[in-house]
Design a protein with these regions (language model features):
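RecA-like P-loop NTPase motor core of helicase/translocase proteins
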Residues: 1-230
Length: 230
């Protein structure tokens, strides 16, 4: 049985866990959640808090949503939720630089009409700042620290360590939430039949390497549905 089928059963029998107030309160007040976005949040929260659903494995979640349906808003809300759950370091990576820049606008630019968080983020009575970082070596655990990268740059940084860039040690020493948009691009280089050397040079190998470096890390992938052709 697929995970979504298990969650559908839970929804019918016991009901899904509700979205906590702090999550809604710390999103931009112009945002009105759509029904399917509420479902997405409740599905994740129920899954995250149900040991039987992930069988004590590292949490690795795929959100399969249509282009323009508000995937980035879901990411923003889950960043808040996971921060409250003890995660302060987030790696956002995607295949194209322009998507990285658009997401920075959504997450970092308070003056933008597309900014997704509240003007002031307050969790458990504390003001929480969102900071863009180049790596996770000296991050403040009281902040939400986000490192933005392309999949290609992430792979290069891990393969050719440089000063102030991400290294595998960042991921061994800290719990990191990995967030990938348009994640179907991540595994385009790894195919059946490739030899081990080619696989170790792939982007997918690098992503899996950082994910498994610390058992406490979490992975959230977002995948767009293809356009409907009529």
């Amino acid at each position: 049985m697929f995970l979504y089928e298990k969650l559908d059963t839970i929804k019918e029998v016991d009901g899904l866990l509700l979205i906590p107030h702090f999550l809604k309160d710390n999103l931009n007040n112009r945002v009105e959640l759509r029904d399917y976005q509420i479902d997405a949040f409740q599905n994740f929260i129920t899954y995250y808090n149900s040991e039987g659903l992930h069988k004590n494995k590292q949490i690795h979640t795929l959100l399969h949503m249509a282009t323009g349906s508000g995937k980035t808003l879901i990411m923003a809300g889950l960043i808040l939720y996971l921060y409250k759950s003890g995660y302060c370091n987030f790696l956002f990576f995607v295949n194209m630089t322009n998507i990285v820049e658009k997401t920075k606008e959504n997450f970092m630019n308070r003056l933008s009409s597309k900014y997704l968080f509240a003007e002031t983020i307050e969790i458990d009575g504390d003001i929480v700042d969102i900071r863009e970082v180049d790596n996770f070596q000296n991050t403040n655990e009281n902040d939400i620290n986000i490192c933005f990268s392309t999949t290609q740059k992430l792979h290069f940084d891990l393969s050719v360590p440089q000063e102030n860039s991400l290294t595998i040690e960042d991921f061994e020493d800290k719990k990191i939430v990995l967030i990938s948009d348009e994640s179907h691009h991540v595994n385009t280089l790894t195919k059946k039949g490739k030899d081990d050397i080619a696989e170790e040079q792939s982007w997918e190998y690098s992503v899996n390497r950082v994910f498994t470096a610390n058992r406490g890390s979490r992975k959230l992938f977002c995948l767009s549905l293809p356009p409907l052709v009529i």
